Design a protein with these regions (language model features):
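Conserved alpha-helical scaffold flanking the Walker A/P-loop in AAA+ ATPase domains
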Residues: 39-43, 96-116, 145
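Walker A/P-loop
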Residues: 45-82
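Canonical AAA+ ATPase core
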Residues: 97-102, 122-127, 135-228, 268-273
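Single conserved hydrophobic/aromatic residue that forms the stacking wall/gate
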Residues: 1-11
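Pre-Walker A (pre-P-loop) alpha-helix and adjacent loop at the N terminus of AAA/AAA+ ATPase modules
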Residues: 15-59, 239
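AAA+/P-loop NTPase substrate/partner-engagement loops
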Residues: 71-99
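Terminal-proximal interaction/regulatory segments of ATP-powered molecular machines
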Residues: 299-327
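Basic, amphipathic alpha-helical bundle interface domains used for macromolecular binding and assembly
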Residues: 200-304, 309-310
Length: 327
């Protein structure tokens, strides 16, 4: 199937599965390994959400974001978040045209299909708020005038761990707007050699990946994801997982209902990537940490114990009955 054919008529879940595999194969030509993490990034995009890649520098976060934009055929913009970045640097601003004697609006980097918000936690909260409106509402407001953003619109943000010098802790409201938070981690020895080998063979730094879809294809695939069946027992399992985080002894603030919704949305998309038109409990388990961990606040007195939101989610997973499983 050629680019642009996926969206012809109504995209079924089978076509969305085929599109997903084409996109992942394309991205895999640039990003070595990390298949599970790449599947989760694509699942978040297919579910219509935004992704936070939180990891140390040099582990392929920016490369992955750019590769997905190329493979999906989306208009791509990169914004480098720095301590002196202003909201207008993201949204755009009104400029006076002396020839026409009027103000005209100059669009900022938010006017795109896929925004790479690089090192998003290095900019002050005021600028982060401008990004939050775009993520939450799909629009921006400049001097009282509202501008709708393009569809599809997705943010892939990268962040360094908060222990790094010069970082601002992302506010809970903004973290909650990311459908998933992921970490690639360090590659193993074979993967790291593959990175070097590819670079040596290429003889240049830049690399591009083949386009596997376009914006219309992505929108059609997102509609197909909405048709994935959710059994009530699996839906209640998602609710039980989110609710269990609120009652955990180490948690100050557990996952909100948006967390249980994120579980369903991500699990739906992952089911499509895996070739099914229904959610299985295994899909929910696979997305639980990326969907819930960043929505959990640990009690301050436990900050020095290295307990994380991911630890809480894993403990909740092990203690919550799985649908269809015997007690």
């Amino acid at each position: 199937i050629e680019v642009g054919d996926w969206s012809s008529d109504v995209c079924s879940s089978d076509l969305a599965t085929a599109l997903s595999r084409e996109v992942l194969a394309s991205v895999g030509r640039a990003v070595v390994g990390k298949r599970e993490e790449l599947e989760l990034v694509l699942a978040a995009v297919l579910a219509g959400g935004h992704v936070l890649l939180e990891d140390f520098p040099g582990l392929g976060k920016t490369l992955a974001a750019r590769s997905f934009a190329q493979a999906l055929g989306l208009e791509f913009t990169r914004a480098q978040f720095t301590p002196d970045l202003l909201p207008g640097d993201l949204t755009g601003s009104f400029l006076f045209d002396p020839r026409r004697q009027e103000f005209s609006f100059r669009e900022g980097p938010l006017f795109t299909n896929l925004l790479l918000a690089d090192e998003v936690n290095r900019t002050p909260p005021k600028t982060q708020a401008a990004l939050l409106e775009a993520m939450q509402e799909g629009q921006i407001t400049v001097e009282g005038t509202t501008f709708p953003l393009a569809r599809p619109f997705h943010v892939i943000a990268t962040a360094n761990p908060v222990e790094h010098e010069g970082t601002y802790r992302l506010p809970e409201a903004q973290l909650d707007r990311f459908l998933a938070r992921l970490s690639f981690g360090y590659p193993d020895a074979q993967e790291e050699w593959s990175v070097l080998d590819r670079r040596i063979a290429r003889r240049r730094e830049e690399q591009t990946v083949p386009r596997a879809a376009d914006a219309a294809d992505l929108l059609a695939a997102q509609e197909a994801v909405e048709t994935v069946r959710v059994d009530p027992s699996v839906g209640r399992y998602c609710v039980a997982l989110a609710a269990a985080t609120r009652g955990h002894r180490a948690v100050r603030l557990g996952a909100s209902p948006r967390g249980s919704l994120a579980l369903v949305l991500l699990a739906r998309a992952l089911a499509v990537i895996r070739g099914r038109d229904y959610i299985a409990p295994e899909d929910v388990k696979a997305v639980a940490v990326p969907a819930l961990a960043h929505r959990i606040s640990i009690r301050p007195e436990l900050w020095m114990t290295s307990v994380t939101g991911a630890d809480v989610v894993r403990e909740v997973l092990s203690g919550t009955p799985v649908p269809g499983a015997r007690p």
